[in-house]
C-alpha cells in the first residue's frame, strides 16, 4: 500500500489539531509538512501548538518544524494538503496552493459557493468529486501535469443534516420542505475566541453567526446535481426545495444534534417503517470503495425513545457514522426525526480525511 504525503495548514488551531491526530494513526497518509502563522514558523510543533485534544500529541509529530502557510519547502512534496485555516485568511492562501499544482481539501467556507468547486460530505455526495477527476484526466490526457484543485468540506451541521436526506431522496424522491433546529456543540466554535465559559455554562445561545444561511444553501448544493458538461454544480432551486434552519449553541463538547421535519414531494408518502428500513440499508460509496475510515454502518437507526444522545452516540464508527432516532410522523409535514453527528470528525477534519481516501482510491492523488 502506497503512503501519501500530507500537509496541514492552520496546524495549531482546533481543526488543524484534529487533522494531525487523525493522520498520525492513518495507514495511508503521513504528515510531511505543517503550516501556521509567522509567529509559529520555525518552531517545533510541540512548542508552537497549545495542544487541546483529549489524546496526547503524537510523538511522531512533536518535532516537525512548522512552516509558514506558503506553497514552498516540504509542502511542494505533498500529495494532498488539508486546510484548517480560518476563513479570514484561507482564501488567498488556499488559492496559492492550488495555483502551485497542489490538491487542497479545505474546511474553510471561502470557496464553497464556487460553481466548479465540489462541496462534499463524503458519506453523502462523493460523486461530486467526479468534476475534479474529469479536470485532472483532461489535463493529463493533453500531456500536462496534474493540475491543482480544491475540494471543500461542508459546514459541520450540514453534514449531519444531509446524511439521512440522501438515501431518502434516492428511495422516495424529492423533499420539497425541510426544517431543522440544531443543538450545536461548543467545539464547533474552535479554541480562540471560541465560546466564553460564562456565556455557555447554564445556558443556551440561540444564535450562531452565518450558520443558518449555510445550512439552508449548502443542503441544496450537496443534494443537487451537475450540469451536462460535468463542469459545474447545479443546486436544487428554491422553488423545488425550501429549507428553514434555526441554530443554537449548547453546553456539549462534541456532537451536533438536529431536530428535523421533512415533506416529500411525491404522494403518498412512505411509512415510518419504510423510512427506517431505507436509512438502515444505506451504504455510502466510500464503504464500497473500501476506504479506511468509511463507516461500517453509515446511518445507525436507534429505536430507543431517548436516543440519540451526544455523550452516548457521537463516537459510533469512530465518529464517521451518523445516528438517527425518534423517527415518527409529523402532523405538519410528513416525518420528524433527531439526528446526531460528530462535528469535528464527519463534520470537519474526519470528512477531509475520508475525502482524501476517496481521491486516493480513484487515483486522483
Swiss-Prot record:
Disruption phenotype: Inviable; the presence of homoserine in the medium does not rescue growth. The keyword Oxidoreductase applies. It is an enzyme of class 1 (oxidoreductase). It comes from the Eukaryota. Pathway: Amino-acid biosynthesis; L-methionine biosynthesis via de novo pathway; L-homoserine from L-aspartate: step 2/3; Amino-acid biosynthesis; L-threonine biosynthesis; L-threonine from L-aspartate: step 2/5. Belongs to the aspartate-semialdehyde dehydrogenase family. Homotetramer; dimer of dimers. This is Aspartate-semialdehyde dehydrogenase. It comes from Candida albicans (strain SC5314 / ATCC MYA-2876). The gene is HOM2.
Amino acid at each position: 500500500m502506497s503512503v501519501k504525503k500530507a500537509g496541514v495548514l492552520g496546524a495549531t488551531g482546533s481543526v488543524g489539531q484534529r487533522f494531525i491526530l487523525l493522520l498520525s494513526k492513518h495507514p495511508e497518509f503521513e504528515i510531511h509538512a505543517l503550516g501556521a502563522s509567522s509567529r509559529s514558523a520555525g518552531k517545533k510543533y510541540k512548542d508552537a501548538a497549545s495542544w487541546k485534544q483529549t489524546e496526547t500529541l503524537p510523538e511522531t509529530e512533536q518535532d516537525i518544524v512548522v512552516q509558514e502557510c506558503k506553497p514552498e519547502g516540504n509542502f511542494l512534496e505533498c500529495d494532498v494538503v488539508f486546510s484548517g485555516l480560518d476563513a479570514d485568511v484561507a482564501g488567498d492562501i488556499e488559492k496559492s496552493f492550488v495555483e502551485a499544482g497542489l490538491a487542497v481539501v479545505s474546511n474553510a467556507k471561502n470557496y464553497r459557493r464556487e460553481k466548479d468547486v465540489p462541496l462534499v460530505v463524503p458519506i453523502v455526495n462523493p460523486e461530486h468529486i467526479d468534476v475534479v477527476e474529469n479536470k485532472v484526466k483532461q489535463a493529463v490526457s493533453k500531456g500536462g501535469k496534474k493540475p491543482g484543485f480544491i475540494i471543500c468540506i461542508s459546514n459541520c451541521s450540514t453534514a449531519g443534516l444531509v446524511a439521512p436526506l440522501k438515501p431518502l431522496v434516492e428511495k422516495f424522491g424529492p423533499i420539497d420542505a425541510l426544517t431543522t433546529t440544531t443543538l450545536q456543540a461548543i467545539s464547533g466554535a474552535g479554541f480562540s475566541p471560541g465560546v466564553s465559559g460564562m456565556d455557555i455554562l447554564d445556558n443556551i445561545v440561540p444564535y450562531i453567526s452565518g450558520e443558518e444561511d449555510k445550512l439552508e444553501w449548502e443542503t441544496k448544493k450537496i443534494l443537487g446535481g451537475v450540469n451536462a458538461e460535468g463542469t459545474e454544480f447545479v443546486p436544487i432551486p428554491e422553488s423545488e426545495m425550501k429549507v428553514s434552519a434555526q441554530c443554537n449553541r449548547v453546553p456539549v463538547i462534541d456532537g451536533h444534534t438536529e431536530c428535523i421535519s421533512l415533506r416529500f414531494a411525491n404522494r403518498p408518502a412512505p411509512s415510518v417503517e419504510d423510512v427506517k428500513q431505507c436509512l438502515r440499508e444505506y451504504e455510502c460509496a466510500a464503504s464500497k470503495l473500501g476506504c479506511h475510515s468509511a463507516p461500517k454502518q453509515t446511518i445507525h437507526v436507534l429505536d430507543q425513545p431517548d436516543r440519540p444522545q451526544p455523550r452516548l452516540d457521537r463516537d459510533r464508527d469512530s465518529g464517521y457514522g451518523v445516528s438517527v432516532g425518534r423517527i415518527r410522523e409529523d402532523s405538519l409535514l410528513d416525518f420528524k426525526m433527531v439526528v446526531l453527528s460528530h462535528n469535528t470528525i464527519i463534520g470537519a477534519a474526519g470528512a477531509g480525511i475520508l475525502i482524501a481516501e476517496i481521491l486516493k482510491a480513484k487515483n486522483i492523488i
